[in-house]
Amino acid sequence: LTCCNQQSSQPKTTTDCADNSCYKKTWKDHRGTRIERGCGCPQVKPGIKLECCKTNECNN
């Protein structure tokens, strides 16, 4: 599975994942909205929005 792994609004980069899912975490801090992308479907703390999906580059 190919997942996107760029941070926030950086140009898209991808990585090959052994997991069968990709994730996208979104939260806000003093710098504004932050986005983290990667492989798998991690646990997140309250207040962080998590989207997981199972197709190539679905977490862009």
UniProtKB/Swiss-Prot annotation:
SUPFAM superfamilies: Snake toxin-like. Coiled coil: none annotated. It is found in: Secreted. GO terms for molecular function: acetylcholine receptor inhibitor activity; ion channel regulator activity; toxin activity. Expressed by the venom gland. Disulfide bonds join C3-C22, C17-C39, C41-C52, C53-C58. The keyword Secreted applies. GO terms for cellular component: extracellular region. Keywords: Acetylcholine receptor inhibiting toxin, Disulfide bond, Ion channel impairing toxin, Neurotoxin, Postsynaptic neurotoxin, Secreted, Toxin. It comes from the Eukaryota. InterPro entries: Snake_3FTx, Snake_toxin-like_sf, Snake_toxin_con_site, Toxin_cobra-type. Belongs to the three-finger toxin family. Short-chain subfamily. Type I alpha-neurotoxin sub-subfamily. Binds to muscle nicotinic acetylcholine receptor (nAChR) and inhibit acetylcholine from binding to the receptor, thereby impairing neuromuscular transmission. This is Short neurotoxin C.
